[in-house]
């Protein structure tokens, strides 16, 4: 866990400082059943702990997906432009 707090985990998209740890980790522990509690209900009701922070995270994820789609479209457009090679005279250039 020290590596995650120091930011050495390059695979995580969202930094841990973005979250209020108490509001995020406790519902996750309740959901996964790792938190030792007397209630044996396994229902995972995270809607009660939703805050504006959670909603903004969902919006950011959707925006990232749209940006990725836009990037793939740009790459395809560039590929189409490159399909027409410039006509070469066949003279000069390479000497073997």
From Swiss-Prot:
Maturation-removed propeptide residues: 1-73
InterPro entries referenced in this protein's UniProt entry, alphabetically: PEP
Acidic residues composition-biased segments: 52-71
Biased composition (Low complexity): 35-49
Keywords: Plant defense
Ranges in a coiled coil: none
Region (Disordered): 32-96
Site label Required for ligand-receptor interaction, positions: 90
Any GO BP annotation: innate immune response
A Pfam family that the UniProt record links to this protein: Pep1_7
Family according to the record: Belongs to the brassicaceae elicitor peptide family.
Protein name stated in the entry: Elicitor peptide 3
Gene: PEP3
């Amino acid at each position: 866990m020290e590596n995650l707090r120091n930011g050495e985990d390059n695979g995580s998209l969202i930094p841990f400082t973005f979250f209020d740890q108490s509001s995020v980790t406790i519902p996750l522990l309740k959901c996964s059943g790792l938190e030792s509690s007397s209630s044996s209900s396994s229902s995972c009701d995270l809607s009660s702990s939703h805050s504006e922070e959670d909603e903004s995270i969902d919006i950011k994820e959707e925006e990232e997906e749209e940006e990725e789609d836009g990037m793939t479209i740009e790459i395809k457009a560039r590929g189409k432009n490159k399909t027409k090679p410039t006509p070469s005279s066949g003279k000069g250039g390479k000497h073997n």
